[in-house]
Amino acid sequence: MLSTDTIYALSSGSLPAGVAIIRVSGPETADALVRLCGTLPPPRIATLRTIRTRNGETLDSGLVLYFPTPASFTGEDCCELQVHGGRAVVSAILDELAATGGLRHAEAGEFARRAFQNGKLDLVEVEGLADLIAAETEMQRRLAIEQSGGGQSALYAGWARRLTHSRAMIEAELDFADEDDVPGSVSAVIWEDVGRLRQEIDGHIARAGLAEIIRDGLKIVIAGEPNAGKSSLLNALARRDIAIVTEVAGTTRDVLSVDLSLAGFSVKLFDTAGLRETDELVEREGIRRARQVIADADLVLLLSEKPGHFRIDEVLPENVPVIRVATKVDRPSPSWAPSDADIFLSTRTGEGMADLLTALQSHLPDLAGRTALAMPSRKRHVDCLRQASAALERSLISSDLELRAEQLRQAGDALGRITGRVDVENLLDVIFSEFCIGK
């Protein structure tokens, strides 16, 4: 059910700031603008206005933009007040809006929710918008742009149209098999396309792991025996002191982490307790947590200050790549052979750091030359795609034409749930809660 309330909120960042943007949306927008500014500005033209209280007291002056329905972000009458970003200025304008009848403060994500309800955005675009606001790396920005700009939705819509066409032809064959204007056997052509569509969906699902790395970061765990230089490496890569570094073995008792940006990708770097047998209770808990983090790693940096001490096989998950890093190589002993490690490093002198960064980048996904990042970025997308693929598989192996048509309908519904065109009411509160108040 669509709301008839008119809502307002600060849509820009935290105060104070050079400029603050206050957004209003709903049927009372035009009246609220007239009360604040005296006259309604021309649609979609930034106009300088003095903003006053009901008693004529000047609150501020700024640019005002008015977007009549339906050509606005929310699809409703909407306006933006671009004013000076002082706390007192913004507070006074918000108080004046609150005192205006028919207006209320917006809830988190309510502007975006109205855009969805009014058909201005689908759910994939809404989620992409949330990701774009939260993006911290270049690859996160590119992935979010692909979704918020409608590229991903266009792909799903194309698949849905193919399913609709297939269903229509099959229904025609079922209902009008005796009619001359209905092809006698469309099944062969239709099911070939359904098979191709299933392959396309499965290929799309296979890229979900890459999207997860882009959104959530590549998990790199620094592991090794106590006093191997793990905390020093964490500090060196982070370029600031995060972990305590001493010559005492077992200093790190808990898992420490830091977020980095590497070649446009988000990287989550974990420093762990040294792996050894110990009776000390707190250190044992730290080692247990270290093993847990290693089990979830995308890449392990295995450190040792001595040749032949790269021992982690008992806790390393299958198929997780390992880079063996020889540490403290600025010391005169021990002596390392070239085959003893992959990287030879000294965090004190910086020797080997460039080689390590190059090695880390080689484990990042290769997206060179790819202009679009069409891939499912959320678990719910993958779940719906798997449901669609499973329904298509059932349709391909079934012998009953009516059952096959029903499986195509289920596949189409699964695709529709991704964009929000089918049965998603229970998801909306979760999705829109990711937004700030003014979005």
Curated annotation (Swiss-Prot):
Subcellular location(s) of the protein: Cytoplasm
Gene Ontology cellular-component annotations: cytoplasm
Record-linked PROSITE patterns: G_TRME (PS51709)
InterPro entries: G_TrmE, GTP-bd, GTP-bd_TrmE_N, GTPase_MnmE, MnmE_dom2, MnmE_helical, P-loop_NTPase, Small_GTP-bd
Residues reported in the UniProt entry to bind K(+): N227, T246, V248, T251
Note on cofactor: Binds 1 potassium ion per subunit.
Single GO term (MF): GTPase activity
CDD domains: trmE, TrmE_N
Keywords: Cytoplasm, GTP-binding, Hydrolase, Magnesium, Metal-binding, Nucleotide-binding, Potassium, tRNA processing
Pfam family membership, one: MMR_HSR1
GO biological process per UniProt: tRNA methylation; tRNA wobble uridine modification
TrmE-type G domain mapped to chain residues: 217-365
Annotated (6S)-5-formyl-5,6,7,8-tetrahydrofolate binding sites: R23, E80, K120, K439
Record bears the keyword Zinc: no
Record: residues binding Mg(2+): S231, T252
Positions contributing to GTP binding: 227-232, 246-252, 271-274
Complexes and interactors: Homodimer. Heterotetramer of two MnmE and two MnmG subunits.
Family under the similarity heading: Belongs to the TRAFAC class TrmE-Era-EngA-EngB-Septin-like GTPase superfamily. TrmE GTPase family.
Known role: Exhibits a very high intrinsic GTPase hydrolysis rate. Involved in the addition of a carboxymethylaminomethyl (cmnm) group at the wobble position (U34) of certain tRNAs, forming tRNA-cmnm(5)s(2)U34.
Protein name according to UniProt: tRNA modification GTPase MnmE
Protein source organism: Rhizobium meliloti (strain 1021)
Organism lineage string: Bacteria, Pseudomonadati, Pseudomonadota, Alphaproteobacteria, Hyphomicrobiales
